[in-house]
Structure formats: structure tokens, C-alpha cells
Swiss-Prot record:
TM regions (residue ranges): 32-49
E.C. no: 2.8.2.23
Compositional bias annotation for Low complexity: 66-85
Name of encoding gene: HS3ST6
Organism: Homo sapiens (Human)
Disease tied to this protein: Angioedema, hereditary, 8: A form of angioedema, a disorder characterized by episodic local swelling involving subcutaneous or submucous tissue of the upper respiratory and gastrointestinal tracts, face, extremities, and genitalia. HAE8 inheritance is autosomal dominant.
Catalysed reactions, semicolon-separated: alpha-D-glucosaminyl-[heparan sulfate](n) + 3'-phosphoadenylyl sulfate = 3-sulfo-alpha-D-glucosaminyl-[heparan sulfate](n) + adenosine 3',5'-bisphosphate + H(+)
Residues binding substrate, per UniProt: 122-128, 153-156, 220-221
Known outcome of mutating residue 144 to S: In HAE8; uncertain significance
Disulfide bonds: 288-300
Enzyme class, spelled out: transferase
GO-annotated cellular components: Golgi membrane
Protein name: Heparan sulfate glucosamine 3-O-sulfotransferase 6
């Protein structure tokens, strides 16, 4: 029995010693396992093609004072005042057309007025950049004080199908200015501008008339823009005629103070920009500013303004005049203005 007890005691002692050695062994292996796991994770991340994909570039942040929520109306809740003098507002007035009608000249003339703050470049928000959102659009605008008017001009709006609906969604009270010009001379001026950038352009005849000999090709944008009545018809589905002012591109050259005076009246502004601000540059055939905004010297518009037009045979000019005549007459009826284009 004693032997059995001894044997039992020896076995128990051996098991206790073995358990102690196993625990010690496991304890000694733990740091090694931890090191192996860390090294394994590092190797996985360091192997080519195994790193996490690079984070996408963040979307352009809005201007510091802009809210992150979407905006649907000027002055809507959640649009805090911008820091600094004044605040950025949605435009109360837009020069929406037309290309090569005199929009740049009108904008520069209006910028002489102390109560007009205008964006210098064309933002193309309502035709090309609408997906960026109204908060982004407002962040582009200059700061204005109470009583000042924010403006921008993008002449392609007038011929953009979606523009009237989008502008109405921003504000149904927006005032719309359209500078129009004889559609024949406008088309030739449009062609001259394109030709200056694309020397290998086909002839005016080849573009304006199908196969150079057939009927007028309204698929060519230079021709299609001049169908003012058709474009206006679409705009009138969203805005009443009282929201429009139609400025004569021809009178903007011959009597800039008179046309700018009409615009100031339309915007509810005092007539500050007058004859004293203009002089006629015989070389360019254009009115120039005696004192440009922010300057003390006279200034004419850019070199591209008043560029010579290519010679177009009179027979082609007459065909275009005949083509546009019914559209012009309808435009006169719609606007209540006779622009004298025939």
C-alpha cells in the first residue's frame, strides 16, 4: 500500500512537474507568437498589390461660408452670412444671350455702376456645370452689400434647353437680359471667331448652306442661334415677358449710354453710367470706356472685339436675310420691339 501510495505520489508529482513545465513553455512561446503575427501582418501589407487602395481625392470643398446642404432659393434657411464685408448671393440678374451679340461689352459697361457686382468670367453653370450644385455656384459670386445687384453673363444659356427651368428653380424672380443682333451679321461674326481659332475651317458657304448650295443649314450652331423667336418661345414657358429686357447689339455700339440706361432702369438702378463714360474708337469701330472699373486710364475691350469679318458674297447674305425674315418678324411681335433687321 505504501508502495502504491509511493507510486501514486510519484505519478502525481510527475504530473505536477509536467504541468508546470507545459505552462512555462506556453508562456515562453507567447511573445514569439505575437512577434510572428506582427511580422506576418507587416509582410502582407508590404507585398506589391496588397496595400489598401489609395483614398479617392476628396470632392472640392465649398467656399468657407457655404453650407453643405443643398440650396433651392436665394435667402433660404441655412444660408449664413459670409464672413467679411457683404455676402455671396445668387445673381438677381443674368445676361443670358446671345453669343457675339455684345454681351461682354454690356457687362463691362454695367460694371462701372457702383451698385452692380458682376462675375468677370462665364461660369456656364446652367448649361455645363449644373451638377456641381447651387452652393458651388453661389461661392463663385462676388460679395455684395445690401442694395447691390449680383450679376453674371453666359450667352449660351439662351440656346440651352435646360437653362430656363434651372434658372427658374434657383429663383423665379430672376431678371433676364438678352443682347440680340442682326442674325446674319451675328452668324458671320461667330464664324470669324471660330475661324481665328481653327484656321482649317470650311468656308462660310459650306457651313451655312447644305452642301454649299442647298437650303440654309439650321444644324450649324452659328445659324441656329439666330432663330431668336424659337428660343424665346421656350423661355416664356418659365418666365413672363416682363422678366426680360432685350438690348440691341447695334444700338449698344451706336448709343451705348442709351442702351445701358435702359438696362439700369430695368434693374431698378439710378442712371449712373452715362455719356461721360464712353468715347468712340474709330480704329476698332467700337465704343470704349473713358475710365474702366478699377483703373484711371481709358480702356477698350479685348483685341478680339471688333476683329475684321471674312468677306461673304452678297448673294449669300441676301439668302440668309430672306431665311431669317419671318423669324425676325415673329421676334418683333413677341418682344414688342422692332430691331430694324428686315
Amino acid at each position: 500500500m505504501a508502495g502504491s501510495g509511493g507510486l501514486g505520489g510519484g505519478a502525481g508529482g510527475g504530473q505536477g512537474a509536467g504541468a508546470g513545465q507545459g505552462a512555462a513553455l506556453r508562456a515562453s512561446r507567447a511573445p514569439m507568437l505575437l512577434v510572428a503575427l506582427v511580422l506576418g501582418a507587416y509582410c502582407l501589407c508590404a507585398l506589391p498589390g496588397r496595400c489598401p487602395p489609395a483614398a479617392r481625392a476628396p470632392a472640392p470643398a465649398p467656399a468657407p461660408s457655404e453650407p453643405s446642404s443643398s440650396v433651392h432659393r436665394p435667402g433660404a434657411p441655412g444660408l449664413p452670412l459670409a464672413s467679411g464685408p457683404g455676402r455671396r448671393r445668387f445673381p438677381q440678374a443674368l445676361i443670358v444671350g446671345v453669343k457675339k451679340g455684345g454681351t461682354r461689352a454690356l457687362l463691362e459697361f454695367l460694371r462701372l455702376h457702383p451698385d452692380v457686382r458682376a462675375l468677370g468670367s462665364e461660369p456656364h453653370f446652367f448649361d455645363r456645370c449644373y451638377e456641381r450644385g447651387l452652393a458651388w455656384y453661389r461661392s463663385l459670386m462676388p460679395r455684395t452689400l445690401d442694395g447691390q445687384i449680383t450679376m453674371e453673363k453666359t450667352p449660351s444659356y439662351f440656346v440651352t434647353r435646360e437653362a430656363p427651368r434651372r434658372i427658374h428653380a434657383m429663383s423665379p424672380d430672376t431678371k433676364l437680359i438678352v443682347v440680340v443682333r442682326n442674325p446674319v451679321t451675328r452668324a458671320i461674326s461667330d464664324y470669324a471667331q471660330t475661324l481665328s481659332k481653327t484656321p482649317g475651317l470650311p468656308s462660310f458657304r459650306a457651313l451655312a448652306f447644305r452642301h454649299g448650295l442647298g437650303p440654309v443649314d439650321t444644324a450649324w450652331s452659328a445659324v441656329r442661334i439666330g432663330l431668336y423667336a424659337q428660343h424665346l418661345d421656350h423661355w416664356l414657358r418659365y418666365f413672363p415677358l416682363s422678366h426680360f429686357l432685350f438690348v440691341s447689339g447695334e444700338r449698344l455700339v451706336s448709343d451705348p449710354a442709351g442702351e445701358v440706361g435702359r438696362v439700369q432702369d430695368f434693374l431698378g438702378l439710378k442712371r449712373v453710367v452715362t455719356d461721360k463714360h464712353f468715347y468712340f474708337n474709330a480704329t476698332k469701330g467700337f465704343p470704349c470706356l473713358k475710365k474702366a472699373q478699377g483703373g484711371s486710364r481709358p480702356r477698350c475691350l479685348g483685341k478680339s472685339k471688333g476683329r475684321p469679318h471674312p468677306r461673304v458674297p452678297q448673294a449669300l447674305v441676301r439668302r440668309l436675310q430672306e431665311f431669317y425674315r419671318p423669324f425676325n418678324r415673329r421676334f418683333y411681335q413677341m418682344t414688342g420691339q422692332d430691331f430694324g433687321w428686315g
